[in-house]
Amino acid sequence: MDSLAGLVLCGVSLLLYGVVEGAMDLILINSLPLVSDAETSLTCIASGWHPHEPITIGRDFEALMNQHQDPLEVTQDVTREWAKKVVWKREKASKINGAYFCEGRVRGQAIRIRTMKMRQQASFLPATLTMTVDRGDNVNISFKKVLIKEEDAVIYKNGSFIHSVPRHEVPDILEVHLPHAQPQDAGVYSARYIGGNLFTSAFTRLIVRRCEAQKWGPDCSRPCTTCKNNGVCHEDTGECICPPGFMGRTCEKACEPHTFGRTCKERCSGPEGCKSYVFCLPDPYGCSCATGWRGLQCNEACPSGYYGPDCKLRCHCTNEEICDRFQGCLCSQGWQGLQCEKEGRPRMTPQIEDLPDHIEVNSGKFNPICKASGWPLPTSEEMTLVKPDGTVLQPNDFNYTDRFSVAIFTVNRVLPPDSGVWVCSVNTVAGMVEKPFNISVKVLPEPLHAPNVIDTGHNFAIINISSEPYFGDGPIKSKKLFYKPVNQAWKYIEVTNEIFTLNYLEPRTDYELCVQLARPGEGGEGHPGPVRRFTTASIGLPPPRGLSLLPKSQTALNLTWQPIFTNSEDEFYVEVERRSLQTTSDQQNIKVPGNLTSVLLSNLVPREQYTVRARVNTKAQGEWSEELRAWTLSDILPPQPENIKISNITDSTAMVSWTIVDGYSISSIIIRYKVQGKNEDQHIDVKIKNATVTQYQLKGLEPETTYHVDIFAENNIGSSNPAFSHELRTLPHSPASADLGGGKMLLIAILGSAGMTCITVLLAFLIMLQLKRANVQRRMAQAFQNREEPAVQFNSGTLALNRKAKNNPDPTIYPVLDWNDIKFQDVIGEGNFGQVLKARIKKDGLRMDAAIKRMKEYASKDDHRDFAGELEVLCKLGHHPNIINLLGACEHRGYLYLAIEYAPHGNLLDFLRKSRVLETDPAFAIANSTASTLSSQQLLHFAADVARGMDYLSQKQFIHRDLAARNILVGENYIAKIADFGLSRGQEVYVKKTMGRLPVRWMAIESLNYSVYTTNSDVWSYGVLLWEIVSLGGTPYCGMTCAELYEKLPQGYRLEKPLNCDDEVYDLMRQCWREKPYERPSFAQILVSLNRMLEERKTYVNTTLYEKFTYAGIDCSAEEAA
C-alpha cells in the first residue's frame, strides 16, 4: 500500500513538472562552445512567455566543482524581450572553461538547462557536447585525441576520477564503455592528460532517461508518442521535445529556415542564420546544432542528402522531391509526410480565431473559449490555456464545427491576481501556435457595513439599507436584502429605496440581515456584506431567570431557576425541553407548575451530554431561554490522562502537561511524584481541582535526582487506574544557587559585627533544616507551591527581589550610572505610576541619548516591585538587537532610575497611526495612490523583528505578558524592539495573584479565565499585535466592551480579517488564536513563515489606495479601559 501511495505521489509530482515545463519555452544558446581567441557567449531565452521571476545564468557547480568562482556579468539581451546574456571578450578566454546553466521559474518550479564550454586547444575533444540515451542502453562515451603527450590519460565524472589509461596505451579515440546505462551514470565526463588541468580538459555530458526506449510515466509503462526528426520523448510527460527548427506534437512540422522555438517565432539574426550556435533544451534533450548544421562548433553545413540537427537525418524523398538541409523533403502539392510518401490534403499549421485582445470579467466562475482552425483540426488534448502564473488548463468542454475546433475552459474562481496575459495554445502534428490575450478581473462589490435596524416590532423591522461605502468595483446595478431567522435558510428581496420595512416576521425571534450588491456583467453579484443581528419584540412572557443546570447523579440532572412573578392573571407553567446530544431521537418536554423553582430530570443515561432550555407559558407560548448543557455523572472510573509530557526540566523544576477525555465527569487531576528508590508512602500529591488546566510546574525538586511521576484523573466514582510511571531526572545544581555566599558577605559588610551573629544563627538554622529535610519533604514541597513574593530591595549596584524560597537568589548586579552623568531633557512618556524622560548620559566615557524610566511618588508597592523586576529581567536577558537593551541604572534618594536605549521613532502603535497618510496628508495620499507611508515589506519587517525578539525571550524562558504595539519601540534604521518588561516573568508558567489593570484585548483565553500566562499566551498576544500592524494601528475588537470579549472569545469569536490583508497573513493570526495553547505555533515557526513571505516579495499587506478605502477603527477609550 505504501509503495502504491508513493507511486501516486511520484506521478503527481511528475505531472506538475510537465505542466510547468510546458508553460515556459526556455532555450539556452551556446555560441562557440570551443573557446579560442574569439568572442563567445551564452544567451538564455524565455520564448513567447512573460515570466514573473527573472531568468538567470550561472555556473553549474553541481556538475563541475573545481571551476572558476568569479561571478558572471549577466546582462539583458537588447535584441529580445525576455532574454539574458553573458559575453566573454577575447582577453577573458582563460576564465571561460566550465559548466553553466540557464534557469527559469514558473509557479515556484524551476526549469534548468545545462551546457559547457572548453578550450579548442584541449588535449582531447568530445565526439558530442551532450549524449542522450535510454535506461539500459549500452553507451560508449568517446574523446578524440588531439595532442600527443607521453603521459597517462585520465577520465573524470563530475570532477571525480574514474579511469586512467597508461601513456603507451592511449588510443586515438579514448572511450568509456557503460553497459546497461542507469540514471546514476548520468553526469559530466571529462578527459585530459594526468599532467593537465581544467583548461586542457574536454567535457561531454551524458543524459540517461529514467525509462527504457519509447517508454514514459512514473513506472515507465506508458508508450511514447513517436517523435519525428530526432525529437526526444520526455520520460515525465510523454511529450516530444522538438529539436531547434521543428515544431508540433510529433516534431514533424519544419520551421522556416533560421527560425526556432516551440512556435518557430524566434529567429537567428546573423548573416549566416544559426551557424556557430549550439542550442540547448531542457533534459532529456540536451544540446545540438540547429537544423542544417553540424560539428562541435555547429559551423559545418549538412552534406547533400542530409538535414536536421547535427545533420543526423537522411532524406529519402519520393517522387524526386528536393531535399533541403533545413527542412528535409519539400513536398509538391498533394503530397505530404517526411519522405512525401503520402498523398492527400496538405497539413496546415493551426491558427487561433476570434480571440479578442482584452476581456473584462467579474471575479468568480469564468469560462474562456479558444477557437482554432488548421488541418487536421486540433483535438481536445491539443488545446490548452495558460494562466499568468503558468498554470496550464485543459478544456472542460469541446466540440467541432465545419472549420474550427472550439475548446471551452472552466476556472471555478477567477480573482484580481489572475488579471494579466493569458495564452491560448494549440499544438498539433501540423505545428504549434500561441495567442496571448489580456484579462482584467473586476472585484465584485461588497458592503463594508451591515444594514442598520431603525425600529422593530413583534412582526416587522424598519431597515436602513445603504450600499455606501462598499469594497470592490462599481457601478452598483442592484441591491438584495437577505434575511433569515437564526439557524434557518436565507430569503431575499430586491430593494431600491434606502429605507425599507420588512414585514411578516416571527415574534421574539433572532434574525440576521445582510445586503448583496451587484455590478454589470455576467456573475456580477458580489458576496453578501457584514451581518446585522436583531430580535423582534415578544408577545409572550420572558424565559425564567437564573437558570442553572447541574449533574445530580449518574442518571439525573437538576435544573433550577429564580421564582417567577408575572402581572398576568392567567395561570402559567414552565415548559422544560430536554434533548440528548448523543442520541438525536431522545427528546422530552416536561411541564412544571409555575410556583416551583426546580425540576429533576431523571431516567437519563450515564456519561451523556444533554441540552436543556425552558420557557414560561400561559395561553400563549413564552420565549425560549438560551440552551444549557451538562453531562450526567460517570458510571465508571475515568480513563488515564493522555499525551503526558515532561518538559523544561531544570535543577529544581519541571513542566508536566496532559490531556483528558470529555464525558467522564472529571473533577480534578492528581500529580503524584516521589524520588526513585524511596518507599511508596514517601510520595508527594498535588491535587488540581480545575480539570480544564492541562499543565503544571513541579517545583522544589532536588538537583540531579530521578523521580517517578504518575498522573491520575478523579471523578465521582474514584481515581483512574494507574498506568506506567513517567521518569524525570532533574539537572545538576545551577551555579546561580551555589553563589549565595556573595549576598551574605554583602549583608555582613552592611550590618557589621551584628551581622556576624545573624550569620551564625542562620547557619545553625540551615544545618537543622538539612537534617530534618528528609522527614518534611512533602510539607516543604506544598509550601513551595504557595509562596508569595515580598517587597523589593535594592542597593547601589545590586538588585534583590527577595522571595520566600528555599534558597534566595543572588542580588542582580546591574551597570551603575553616576547621578551627575545624567542630563535630563524632555518628558517623552507618562503613565499612571511612571514616567519616561529623554536624557543625555555618559557611559564608559561616551555621551549618548537614553530613555530614563522612573516611578512616581505615589506608586504602589506592587508597582515598585514590577519596576525593579523590569531591571532584573533586562539584566538577565542580555543584549539582543530586537529588544530595548539596558544601558545602566542609578539609585538616587531612594528612587531607582532605569536607563535604556532611546528609540527616536517612538512606539510602534503611534508610528503606525502616523503612517495613515489619507488622514494626515490627503493630497499626498491621492497623488501617490497610497493609504500609508509604509510598504508591505516594512510592515512585515516590523512583524519579523518582534517575532525574532520574542523567540529570544522564549529561549530565555521569559514570559512578556503585555505584548502589544504600544510596547514595541521603533529604533534606528526602523528596527522594532520589544520594550516594557515590567510584567515579564522568568518561568514557563506564571499565575497572576494580584489584581490590577489588564490588557484584556491582547490576552489569551487561558489568561482571561485562569490568570495563567505562558509563552503560548504571548503567542496569542503576538497575533493581536500582527493584526495591529496590518490594520495600521487599529484598535482590536473596536466597538466591543471587555465584558463582551469575556463572553464571545470562548465561543470561537476572533478578530476579523483586515480588508488589506492577504489570506496567508490572516491564517498566521488565526493560528496564534487557537483555543488550545499547545496548538499555537512557536515564535521560531512564526519567524520562519514571515521570513518566507519577505523572501517572496509578494504584497501581503495592501497599502494601495483603492476606491472607498477606510482605515480600521481606533477607540482610545477602549484601549485605556483594557
From Swiss-Prot:
Describe the outcome of a gene knockout: Embryonically lethal. Embryos die at about 10 dpc, due to strongly decreased numbers of blood vessel endothelial cells, leading to severe hemorrhaging, and due to defects in heart trabeculae development. Mice display a general malformation of the vascular network with defective sprouting and dilated blood vessels. Conditional by inversion allele knockout mice don't have Schlemm's canal. Haploinsufficient mice developed a severely hypomorphic Schlemm's canal with convolutions and focal narrowing.
Q: What is its EC number?
A: 2.7.10.1
Task: Classify the source by domain of life.
Answer: Eukaryota
Upon changing residue 853 to A, the result is: Loss of kinase activity
**Residue intervals of the Fibronectin type-III domain:** 444-539, 543-635, 640-733
The chain positions of domain EGF-like read 210-252, 254-299, 301-341
Q: Where does ATP bind?
A: 828-836, 853
The record places the following residue ranges in the Cytoplasmic compartment, namely 768-1122
GO CC terms in record: cytoskeleton; extracellular region; focal adhesion; membrane; perinuclear region of cytoplasm; plasma membrane
Q: What is the effect of changing residue 1100 to F?
A: Reduced levels of autophosphorylation. Abolishes interaction with GRB2 and GRB7. Abolishes phosphorylation of GRB7 and PIK3R1
Question: Which reactions does this protein catalyse?
Answer: L-tyrosyl-[protein] + ATP = O-phospho-L-tyrosyl-[protein] + ADP + H(+)
Per its record, what are the GO molecular function terms?
Answer: ATP binding; protein tyrosine kinase activity; signaling receptor activity; transmembrane receptor protein tyrosine kinase activity
- Protein kinase domain residues: 822-1094
Extracellular compartment: which residues? Answer: 23-746
What does the UniProt entry say about where the protein is found? Cell membrane; Cell junction; Cell junction, Focal adhesion; Cytoplasm, Cytoskeleton
Q: Which residues carry this modification: Phosphotyrosine?
A: 858, 990, 1100, 1106
Top enzyme class, one word, equals transferase
Q: What does this protein do?
A: Tyrosine-protein kinase that acts as a cell-surface receptor for ANGPT1, ANGPT2 and ANGPT4 and regulates angiogenesis, endothelial cell survival, proliferation, migration, adhesion and cell spreading, reorganization of the actin cytoskeleton, but also maintenance of vascular quiescence. Has anti-inflammatory effects by preventing the leakage of pro-inflammatory plasma proteins and leukocytes from blood vessels. Required for normal angiogenesis and heart development during embryogenesis. Required for postnatal hematopoiesis.
- Domain commentary: The soluble extracellular domain is functionally active in angiopoietin binding and can modulate the activity of the membrane-bound form by competing for angiopoietins.
What protein name does the entry list? Angiopoietin-1 receptor
What is the originating organism of this protein? Mus musculus
Q: Identify the gene encoding this protein.
A: Tek
